[in-house]
Amino acid sequence: MTTQAPPSALLPLNPEQLARLQAATTDLSPTQLAWVSGYFWGMLNQQPGTLAATPAPVAEMPGITLISASQTGNARRVAEALRDDLLAAKLSVTLVNAGDYKFKQIANEKLLVVVASTQGEGEPPEEAVALRKFLFSKKAPKLDNTAFAVFGLGDTSYEFFCQAGKDFDSKLAELGGERLLDRVDADVEYQAAAQEWRARVVDVLKARAPSASAAQVAVAATGAVNDVHSSPYTKEAPLSASLAVNQKITGRDSEKDVRHIEIDLGDSGLRYQPGDALGVWYQNDPELVKEIVELVWLKGTEPVTVNGKVLPLAEALQWHFELTVNTANIVENYATLTRSESLLPLVGDKAQLQHYAATTPIVDMLRFSPAQLDADALVGLLRPLTPRLYSIASSQAEVESEVHITVGAVRYEIEGRARAGGASSFLADRVEEEGEVRVFIEHNDNFRLPANPETPVIMIGPGTGIAPFRAFMQQRAADEAPGKNWLFFGNPHFTEDFLYQVEWQRYVKEGVLSRIDLAWSRDQKEKIYVQDKLREQGAELWRWINDGAHIYVCGDANCMAKDVEQALLEVIAEFGGMDAEAADEFLSELRVERRYQRDVY
């Protein structure tokens, strides 16, 4: 249902808060809306006189501040579980997204807990960039009266494992904070470590934090991070959906194989918004499983135990273990286990282990350094299979019970043997139309269209980074939003790699897309990228920014996102008449105001 908002002057909510409230309630029935209204009214009135009290009692309560700094949802889930544990222990706790945290109040925190994931080359999640920058700036206050604990989430397949958590932990201590507990760095399989850490945090805080009344506990619970996204389908309990369309959208001679994938959600009622991601559980290639099994002189029928169930080895490898991403830990453990003459020299050398893992898939490590393993030893080396996240390329305002994604199939060769990405090749090659795909929605409130439909939008998305902007334009078209829209897109070749070309041309013709700037890096001698187009259009870009435009960036975190940010800083400095430091501060303010949002990976 659609509700006409009252004039902003009458609202106690800012436009972004109002947009989140409207998004949270858009699919509720009248009965559900009435229940929600009564629920909030009841919480507000659990104590006599609360109704007339001034707002924001949570901020004034003494107690624990719990900051969630999440990129893919894992840190958020850990933080929410800890919040529930603390509330169950009748402790006063406020849970807040790092992006919503007023970081200048950190000097007033007495008990602070941070749950932080890491992305890219050791960088914090997008929602925590401003907080980290503040803590590492000259403006950071002394924290002599603050006690803190940090839980870091990461992936040992990356060089800068849990770096964001390490950075928060070291800086909070450097500023004078007292560690409640030593930092925990958790790998992809983080659940057991998180459960143990949560129990320790609760025990420590029981002796430090004030107890909360029932009313305070209820009010504190409203500080949860986006609990409004309720669905019976989750990462742990995904929806079994049906693959409807698998269409190659790059040309015959393109070096890239990019697929437009449409998945039918049926009558599941699964809802998403532009900016959200689709989680996809995949199965490994049976041929890869067979190759690995044969390389260690096994048959695949050997029994192994996975999550308490006994399965044949081949089935376990296909459904439950990560086979396409190697890590330094796997290399080191395999070298130690097999006493491999070629791998043992790498043990203890972090840089060499990391390089070997990044350039040598597990199957080729087994081929180059062969050894006979029993089934339990093999699975003991491996990490659990985890779902892949894809930026959603559709809006339900247009596609209703479907969800679309844009998938770049990962393909390469090692010594003449074809290798492929686990999830991308599953979607591109191994799922037939109407075949089953297990999916869930990973909501991302840090990548949202402006609440005001008149606000201009600047979208920067080379390669498959174009995906969420297709969703944005579908939504803006359906809403008949009057705000201007400007797209920057790039890829190697115009004739082979112009993803969704006909759709963008239609949006331009219809006036939905006000401007489009294209960068083809291989169509001329000099390579041209989207960041070059940003500089080229600097004066007009600055005019849009001055008119209140929101800037969105999607795609590669390691190179593109950094190059684009540098170009934006140069444009701001040149056309805004600022020095480098002032331009950096200006862009940081845009981020805090949610006018500069990134979905990078």
Swiss-Prot record:
Span of domain Flavodoxin-like: 64-202
InterPro entries for this protein: CysJ (IPR010199), CysJ-like_FAD-binding (IPR003097), CysJ_Proteobact (IPR029758), FAD-bd_FR_type (IPR017927), Flavdoxin-like (IPR001094), Flavodoxin/NO_synth (IPR008254), Flavoprot_Pyr_Nucl_cyt_Rdtase (IPR001709), Flavoprotein-like_sf (IPR029039)
Superkingdom of this protein's organism: Bacteria
Amino acids binding FMN: 70-75, 117-120, 153-162
EC category: oxidoreductase
Metabolic or biological pathway: Sulfur metabolism; hydrogen sulfide biosynthesis; hydrogen sulfide from sulfite (NADPH route): step 1/1
Signal peptide: none
The FAD-binding FR-type domain, residue ranges: 236-450
UniProt: FAD binding residues: 324, 358, 388-391, 406-408, 412, 421-424, 601
Keywords: Amino-acid biosynthesis, Cysteine biosynthesis, Electron transport, FAD, Flavoprotein, FMN, NADP, Oxidoreductase, Transport
Entry binding sites for NADP(+): S521, R522, K527, I528, Y529, V530, Q531, D563
EC numbers on record: 1.8.1.2
Reactions catalysed according to its record: hydrogen sulfide + 3 NADP(+) + 3 H2O = sulfite + 3 NADPH + 4 H(+)
Co-factor note (free text): Binds 1 FAD per subunit. Binds 1 FMN per subunit.
BP terms from Gene Ontology: cysteine biosynthetic process; hydrogen sulfide biosynthetic process; sulfate assimilation
Cofactor(s) it depends on: FAD; FMN
A GO-annotated cellular component: cytosol
GO molecular function term, any single one: FMN binding
Quaternary structure (record): Alpha(8)-beta(8). The alpha component is a flavoprotein, the beta component is a hemoprotein.
Role, per record: Component of the sulfite reductase complex that catalyzes the 6-electron reduction of sulfite to sulfide. This is one of several activities required for the biosynthesis of L-cysteine from sulfate. The flavoprotein component catalyzes the electron flow from NADPH -> FAD -> FMN to the hemoprotein component.
Classification via NCBIfam families: cysJ, PRK06214.1, PRK10953.1
Family, similarity comment: Belongs to the NADPH-dependent sulphite reductase flavoprotein subunit CysJ family.
Identification of the protein by name: Sulfite reductase [NADPH] flavoprotein alpha-component
Lineage: Bacteria, Pseudomonadati, Pseudomonadota, Gammaproteobacteria, Enterobacterales
